[in-house]
């Protein structure tokens, strides 16, 4: 008798990805975040779909439609806050997922890593456009400031910005196209995530020791399905706590004021998950230089595999690199804090110092430390 699970064309793909997948026996809870990101994406698509049923992408009614969702639609407030805080959970999982990749040397799996960087950019673009949709003060001015950065591109900058705006300022055409793009991008992200998994399953997962585990693997189900389910329960617990008890904790009060092009908020800032990049952008006095630094702050991940001279893949047994990794984490937290502060001293100088440290660690200090560690181990 043939086993349907192993022979059916569709079931076979699911079976080889989530059931009979040979997995290293020693991967820790930090490997849970891939499945949690899948769960976050699912939550965002479902809640987003229900929100789109009631939302109107028009400058005159967008703000009122969000108010209508929260006040008049059955459990509309729950869906809205699940979607808003779900984005925060998404980025929290993303940052831990990337951090785990850096710590354990998962960037050695080049195709998987590069698709991951594309995913990161796509999710950031989607989140930015989603923040514009409620059409509050911070939505409008955030959109104005960030899209206006493209005007720093020599020669074509101004034309490019006006083309994106659909006019001479952020307005109805901008909101309409942002809604269309915000709706379609999660499906593109889903496709990229599948390619990400495809490449991962070509090579197999990395593990905390960074050694080949081909001689000793266990099936994904029931071991890691159970483990992932526990992670999912904890994620839902955190998301529901945030949504039901502190729904506005991570939001900006300015976004409860309808967008007004004639009144600039005293301090324009994006959501918390973009603050580190925003701080790097602001720390450079030159506009074009700031934009380049902003893009490089993420794109630098793409050159990490070529800046890694260590003979050991993971940082598990490299205390100097471990120390620098946690310095990098502290630096990113500092940048996040600075991004939310006004542009005045001492915040300017702290931001500039933290930005220099960020790039120095990534490009120079960490690779040099790898060479020192190799030398100490006489490799």
Swiss-Prot record:
Gene Ontology cellular-component annotations: mitochondrial inner membrane; respiratory chain complex III
The organism of origin for this protein: Lepilemur randrianasoloi (Randrianasoli's sportive lemur)
The protein's required cofactors: heme b
Quaternary structure annotation from Swiss-Prot or TrEMBL: The cytochrome bc1 complex contains 11 subunits: 3 respiratory subunits (MT-CYB, CYC1 and UQCRFS1), 2 core proteins (UQCRC1 and UQCRC2) and 6 low-molecular weight proteins (UQCRH/QCR6, UQCRB/QCR7, UQCRQ/QCR8, UQCR10/QCR9, UQCR11/QCR10 and a cleavage product of UQCRFS1). This cytochrome bc1 complex then forms a dimer.
Function: Component of the ubiquinol-cytochrome c reductase complex (complex III or cytochrome b-c1 complex) that is part of the mitochondrial respiratory chain. The b-c1 complex mediates electron transfer from ubiquinol to cytochrome c. Contributes to the generation of a proton gradient across the mitochondrial membrane that is then used for ATP synthesis.
A GO term, aspect molecular function: ubiquinol-cytochrome-c reductase activity
Family the UniProt entry places it in: Belongs to the cytochrome b family.
Lineage: Eukaryota, Metazoa, Chordata, Craniata, Vertebrata
Binding-site residues, heme b b566: 97, 196
Binding site for heme b b562: 83, 182
Name of protein: Cytochrome b
UniProt cross-references to Pfam families, sorted A to Z: Cytochrom_B_C, Cytochrome_B
Binding residues annotated for a ubiquinone, in chain numbering: 201
């Amino acid at each position: 008798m043939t086993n349907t699970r192993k022979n059916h064309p569709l079931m076979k793909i699911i079976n080889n990805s989530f059931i009979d997948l040979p997995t290293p026996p020693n991967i820790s809870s930090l490997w849970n975040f891939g499945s949690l990101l899948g769960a976050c994406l699912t939550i965002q698509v479902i809640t987003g779909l229900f929100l789109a049923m009631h939302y109107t992408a028009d400058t005159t009614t967008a703000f009122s439609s969000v108010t209508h969702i929260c006040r008049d639609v059955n459990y509309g407030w729950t869906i809205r806050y699940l979607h808003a805080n779900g984005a925060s959970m998404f980025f929290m999982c993303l940052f831990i997922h990337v951090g785990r990749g850096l710590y354990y040397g998962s960037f050695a799996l080049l195709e998987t890593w590069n698709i991951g960087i594309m995913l990161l950019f796509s999710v950031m673009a989607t989140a930015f456009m989603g923040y514009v949709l409620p059409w509050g003060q911070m939505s409008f001015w955030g959109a104005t400031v960030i899209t206006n950065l493209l005007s720093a591109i020599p020669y074509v900058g101004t034309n490019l910005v006006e083309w994106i705006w659909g006019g001479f300022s952020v307005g109805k055409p901008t909101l309409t196209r942002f809604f269309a793009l915000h709706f379609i991008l999660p499906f593109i992200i889903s496709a990229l995530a599948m390619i990400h998994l495809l490449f991962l399953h070509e090579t197999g997962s990395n593990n905390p020791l960074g050694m080949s585990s081909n001689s000793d693997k266990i099936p994904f189900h029931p071991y890691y399905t159970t483990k992932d389910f526990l992670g999912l329960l904890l994620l839902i617990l955190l998301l529901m706590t945030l949504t039901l008890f502190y729904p506005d904790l991570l939001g900006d009060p300015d976004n409860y004021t309808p967008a007004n092009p004639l009144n600039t908020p005293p301090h324009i800032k994006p959501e918390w998950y973009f603050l580190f990049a925003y701080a790097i952008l602001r720390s450079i006095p030159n506009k074009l230089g700031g934009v380049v630094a902003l893009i490089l702050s993420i794109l630098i991940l793409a050159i990490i595999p070529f800046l890694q001279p260590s003979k050991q893949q993971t940082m598990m047994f490299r205390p100097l690199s471990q120390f620098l990794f946690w310095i990098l984490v502290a630096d990113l937290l500092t940048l996040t804090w600075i991004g939310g502060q006004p542009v005045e001293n001492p915040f300017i100088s702290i931001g500039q110092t933290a930005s220099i440290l960020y790039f120095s660690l990534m490009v120079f200090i960490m690779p040099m430390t790898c060479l020192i560690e190799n030398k100490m181990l006489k490799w």
